[in-house]
């Protein structure tokens, strides 16, 4: 068993899990069957990537074996590394929209399953690695507004407002702060979630503690850098805010590579 003070040097086991949506925008959770570690805990279904498989092939196989559904398409979303008592795992979560899977759900391993709303999950206990994931799922995938004046979205719990740090008041739950301002300040603002805005690839390593990263794209170098970062896997939702010409050219590439959302907006001042 690995302790908190010792680095976990066990080999990484590659695991893929599916964020399956239905036509109502609900997410599929299932319980772990008897005989497996954490039996009875709820999770996003999936399993180990076998030798010779791609992550997508493993996802297809696991969902057909466990729940009887066939996945035709999936896109990457978040990547997590988590140490359990029994294993150290590299978790790749993939989004599967309502029209990308077919079949009737079946509990082929005796597990329970449930459709849940992002931000309003009602089943427990949840697998330990899924805590940050559930919070990330509550971030809307579309917004109106501008980073320097505020962004408005909606999830299952209602309105979701992101307020610039310079305009934030104590009651605001979601705060957006520029990485340069955060670095000068030396600590994260107090908030339910902190969004950090960056504009260059050199800033990316410094924002790994953010709940959400907003990447402002104003040139081709930044647009390509977003593609590179997504290809390597991101551990938090990455929202891209791009000038119109870069939005038109790269939007589909970013979303297919795992961007959480893409906004069309011009350059803005630090927030």
Regions found by a protein language model. Give the residues of each.
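Active-site-adjacent beta-strand/loop module that shapes the phosphate/pyrophosphate-binding cleft
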Residues: 80-104, 119, 130
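Short loop-to-alpha-helix "cap/lid" segments that border enzyme active sites
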Residues: 152-156, 169-260, 265-271
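Nudix hydrolase/Nudix homology domain
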Residues: 103-162, 264, 269-271
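A short coil-to-beta-strand element that immediately follows conserved catalytic motifs
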Residues: 70-79
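Conserved hydrophobic/aromatic beta-strand scaffold that supports enzyme active sites
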Residues: 19, 29, 91-95, 115
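Conserved Nudix-box catalytic region and its N-terminal flanking loop in Nudix hydrolases
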Residues: 26-65, 78, 195
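Conserved N-terminal beta-strand and adjoining loop/helix that marks the start
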Residues: 2-27, 48, 79
């Amino acid at each position: 068993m690995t302790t908190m003070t010792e680095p976990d040097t066990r080999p990484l086991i590659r695991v893929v899990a599916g964020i399956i949506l239905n036509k109502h925008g609900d997410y599929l959770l299932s319980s772990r069957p008897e005989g497996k570690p954490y039996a009875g805990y709820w999770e996003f279904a999936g399993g180990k990537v076998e030798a010779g498989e791609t992550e997508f092939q493993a996802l297809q196989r696991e969902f057909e074996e466990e729940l009887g559904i066939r996945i035709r398409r999936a896109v990457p979303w978040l990547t997590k590394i988590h140490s359990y008592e029994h294993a150290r795992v590299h978790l790749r979560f993939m989004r599967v929209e309502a029209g990308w899977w077919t079949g009737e759900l079946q509990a082929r391993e005796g597990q329970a399953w449930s459709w849940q709303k992002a931000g309003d999950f009602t089943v427990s206990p949840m697998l330990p690695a899924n805590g940050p994931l559930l919070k990330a799922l509550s971030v809307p995938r579309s917004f109106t507004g501008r980073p320097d004046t505020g962004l408005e979205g909606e999830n299952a719990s209602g309105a979701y407002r992101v307020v610039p740090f310079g305009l934030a008041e104590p009651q605001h739950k979601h705060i957006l702060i520029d990485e340069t301002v955060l670095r000068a300040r030396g600590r994260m603002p107090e908030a339910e979630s902190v969004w950090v805005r960056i504009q260059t690839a050199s800033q990316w390593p410094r924002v790994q503690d953010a709940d959400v990263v907003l990447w402002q794209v104003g040139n081709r170098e930044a647009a390509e850098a977003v593609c590179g970062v997504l290809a390597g896997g991101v551990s938090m939702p990455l929202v891209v805010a791009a000038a119109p010409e870069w939005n038109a050219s790269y939007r589909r590439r970013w979303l297919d590579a795992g961007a959480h959302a893409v906004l069309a907006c011009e350059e803005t001042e630090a927030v």
